[in-house]
């Protein structure tokens, strides 16, 4: 486990505003995590050259989301963002890194509910095969 994930924690109003300019969804969270990975640190599968940096960063993101929920915090995984704008907004912090997600973090509003796209599930038969 090479741990290629890199987390940029955005807390200032200025930094949060810069991140907002890179994404189509905004959640007014007091903290935004920029989850990236360093390709130079990522494990490469020998058999086909697959770089696992994105996978490792996604696993770390899932663990952060679970830990946040245990602490009573809400998170929203944002994959719809412009990585080039994000790199331009944070050139020093993201130099050489590949951003994979923004993670909005904070206490959810009392009336907050996930959209139906986040609760509807395909039938298990469409996703799992047995042999």
Residue spans for each PLM region:
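Glycine/small-residue-rich phosphate/adenosyl-binding loop
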Residues: 1-57
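Solvent-exposed alpha-helices and their adjacent loops that cap or buttress functional pockets
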Residues: 1-2, 25-27, 92-96, 119-121
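A short, acidic/glycine-rich surface segment
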Residues: 17-20, 42-43, 86-88, 110-114
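Small-aliphatic-rich amphipathic alpha-helix that forms the alpha element of a beta-alpha
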Residues: 33, 41, 48-89
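Short secondary-structure boundary segments
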Residues: 37, 80, 107
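Short, electropositive alpha-helical surface patch
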Residues: 85-100
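C-terminal helix-cap and adjacent tail motif
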Residues: 101-131
């Amino acid at each position: 486990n090479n741990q290629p994930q890199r987390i940029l924690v955005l807390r200032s109003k200025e930094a949060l505003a810069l991140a907002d300019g890179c994404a189509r969804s905004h959640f007014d969270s007091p903290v935004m995590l920029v989850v990236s990975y360093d390709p130079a640190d990522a494990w490469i599968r020998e058999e086909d050259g697959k770089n696992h940096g994105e996978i490792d960063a996604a696993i770390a993101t899932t663990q952060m989301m679970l830990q946040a929920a245990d602490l009573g915090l809400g998170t929203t995984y944002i994959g719809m963002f412009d990585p080039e704008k994000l790199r331009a907004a944070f050139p020093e912090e993201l130099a050489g890194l590949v951003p994979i997600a923004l993670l909005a973090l904070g206490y959810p509003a009392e009336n907050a509910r996930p959209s139906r796209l986040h609760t509807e599930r395909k039938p298990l038969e469409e996703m799992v095969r047995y042999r």
